[in-house]
Each structure stands twice: as C-alpha cells, then as structure tokens.
Amino acid sequence: MTLLEKAKCGEITAEMQYVAEKEGVRPEFICEGVANGDIVILYSSRENIHPVAVGKGLLTKVSASVGMYEEADTVDGEMAKIDAAVKAHADTIMDLSVRGPIEEMREKVLSTVDRPVGTLPMYETLSVAEAKYGTALDMTPDDMFDMIEKQASQGVAFIAVHPGTTLSVIHRAKDEGRIDPLVSYGGSHLIGWMLYNNTENPLYTEFDRLIEICKKYDVVLSFADGMRPGCIADSLDHAQVEELVILGGLVRRAREAGVQVMVKGPGHVPLDEIATTVQLEKKLCYGAPYFVFGCLPTDAAAGYDHITSAIGGAVAAYAGADFLCYVTPAEHIGMPNVDDVYQGVMASRIAAHAGDVAKGHPQAVKWDLDMSVARRAMNWKEQFKLSIDPETAERVWRERSTSFTSECTMCGKYCAMKIVEKYLRAE
C-alpha cells in the first residue's frame, strides 16, 4: 500500500509520526491531511533521507534547484551549491541537470543529502534521446516513461511532469498571442516534440501508465505547469487557466489511484493577482498543495530577483501556497554560483516565514515573539541564535560592535530599547 492508501485507512505510519513531531501537530492531523490530499509527505526509500511534509496547516517549505547546464559544470561544482542550500536550510533539493554525467550527479545527491530530492525526468530524457537519435525530437513515449521509472526506482521523493500541457492548451496560448510564449524548459521541449510529431502529450494520453509507476515506487507527483506565464503581462491568461483545469482532473485521478500529488505554479504574477492565482489552484485542483516559483511580482529587477521572489513569495504563502521554489540573484541573467544559491534560499525562507506569521502558525509566531523579547533584553547571543541566518547576524554585529552588553551601533547611546528600559519600564 502507498502512503496515501494507508492514510485513507487511518493508519499512522512512521513517516507521519516523524513529520508531525517536526511540525508540532498531532499525527492524526497529518494522517487526515494526507488522506484528503491537503498534505503530501515527501520521502524516499533511501534511509539517509528524512521525510518532509508539505500542505495545509503546516510550515511553508522552501526548495532549492541545482543542476549541470553548461559543458563546464561539474558534479563537484553542483554539490558545492547543494552544500550551500543545505547550510541555508532548504527543505528539499531538486536536481535539474540537463547535460553531463546526469545519473552520477543524481546518485551523488541521493546518497549525500538528508532531505527529499526531486527531479524532472524529461531533462535526462532529452539528453539521452539527443545522444541516441541525434535529436530529442525523435524520442518516443517509451523513452519518457522508462526514464520516469528509472528515476523513481532510484529513490527520488518527487518527480515533476507536464501532463496538463495538451495540444488544445498549446493552441490556446498561440491564439492569445502571449508576450513571452514559453519559459518552462521541460515544457517547451515537450511542446516542440508534440508539434513536430503532431502527437498529443503522452503524459496526458497515457496518464494511467504514469500513475502505475508512481504507485509502484510511492513517489509524489508534482504537476509542472508548461504554460506558466513568462512575464506578469501574461499572468492568468486562458492557456494558464485551461492547463490548471486539466491538472485538477488529473489530481483526482492520481488520488483515486493512491498516488500523492501536488501542483506547481508560477512564476511571474503581479502582486494583485498572487492571491487569486493561489485561490484558483486550490479551487480547481481540490486543495492540492501548491508549489510556486517565486512568485515574481515585477519583471524589472534583474540581479535582484531573489528580493522580487521574496516579496511575491510572502504574499503567496499568506494566500495559501505551501511550497516555494527559490529564486537566486542570478535569475534571468546567468547561472547561480554558490553564494547566489545561499542568498536565494535565505530570501525564500524569509518569505515563507513571513507568510507563516501572517497565517498565525504557532511556531512562526513564537519565533518572532522570542526574538522581540531578546531584543528588549539586548541579549545578543539569543538574538543571533534566533536569527534566520545566525552566522551572518553575528558576523555583522562583531564587525560593528564591541560588547555583548551594549547597544548596537545603529542608534548607539540613543538606543530606544535602552532608554525605555531606563526611564519607562513598568515595575
């Protein structure tokens, strides 16, 4: 039985107990959430990987994506980025390698990290097909499904696929005249294959085959959105919404078969449409956990898109998004380096936490309250400990202050906390 099937029977598993303790909720709450699809548990057959729960009533999670894209990229170089993501406390890792020793990279990640790993099998399918046929346009549906099963069997916790990107959706996008037609790497290659071969999406027409694989290995499905908007001007157009409607139907089919599923989302969304986007997914996809890429509420911040993403991510988390895919400062302009990865995770974690505070999550609220108490007491060591990035907080303080008992250099002797403590403290 899969985890979802066990939850439907009311069986509380070791994975449910583990994530319940981490989240500060009852195991029964987790079991019920998994059973009705509001919560998914990302876990692996690999003993070194600890489960992570994503969904309604839980802390908002953050995922960091790495992978070999350029010829100069190496396994060791990407592992250094993963180390940075882990140090920054990303909840999950996605290996999105498209070239080089992809299988070696995936095995290294799966055997090294202690948190769930996700993949997008189409990436390796394209690489293998190009080597095998000379062009990825000649790949077959069997190539796609064989790669999905291969990666599922190796212990990945979740796989991203594009089953909702159908020919009708593609023609809808073409007719609408988008500003930026496609920005999904996997989605664009799948669409190119579909149009070249005049063939419907095999992930849609043979969806039962996909479900069988995921059920066999109890892998969480992550429905990727090939039609996610590439700029805020294209947000919530007909193609995006039509794909979401299709995904909603597939969510129900996956659940009925005993497979956990979450839905991925944009991307570029103006601030006033973020809540609507989240609410639409929750409605059309029957409350499935929502995994958003950002969101990015402006297209004009190249070099600072980790900040853009944090702004949109906080709004999305508050509106009900459950999972944030990080965005680095290098987004739209180049491949991220180790520091970019670290900064991207931190920015997304801040967004996730801000959203959790606004939602009134007890752990998040207590964290901020504890920091406020430490600040009033000018307890620097406790403030460092409670900071989302303790190392950076303490480093900056040490560079500019001299004593653990004094005010910081921001206000100096005019420190508001110190003045209040001296003259206005109530006995």
Swiss-Prot record:
What this protein catalyses is:
5-amino-1-(5-phospho-beta-D-ribosyl)imidazole + AH2 + S-adenosyl-L-methionine = 5-hydroxybenzimidazole + 5'-deoxyadenosine + formate + L-methionine + A + NH4(+) + phosphate + 2 H(+)
Molecular function terms from GO: 4 iron, 4 sulfur cluster binding; lyase activity; metal ion binding
- Tell me, what's a Pfam family for it? ThiC_Rad_SAM
One GO process term, biological-process aspect: cobalamin biosynthetic process
Question: Which UniProt keywords are given for this protein, alphabetically ordered?
Answer: 4Fe-4S, Cobalamin biosynthesis, Iron, Iron-sulfur, Lyase, Metal-binding, S-adenosyl-L-methionine, Zinc
Record InterPro entries: ThiC/Bza_core_dom, ThiC/BzaA/B
Query: What is its biological role?
Result: Together with BzaB, catalyzes the conversion of aminoimidazole ribotide (AIR) to 5-hydroxybenzimidazole (5-HBI) in a radical S-adenosyl-L-methionine (SAM)-dependent reaction. Is thus involved in the anaerobic biosynthesis of dimethylbenzimidazole (DMB), the lower axial ligand of vitamin B12 (cobalamin). Requires BzaB for catalytic activity, as BzaA alone displays no activity.
Q: Which family does it belong to?
A: Belongs to the ThiC family. 5-hydroxybenzimidazole synthase subfamily.
Write down what this protein is called: 5-hydroxybenzimidazole synthase BzaA
Biological classification of the source: Bacteria, Bacillati, Bacillota, Clostridia, Eubacteriales
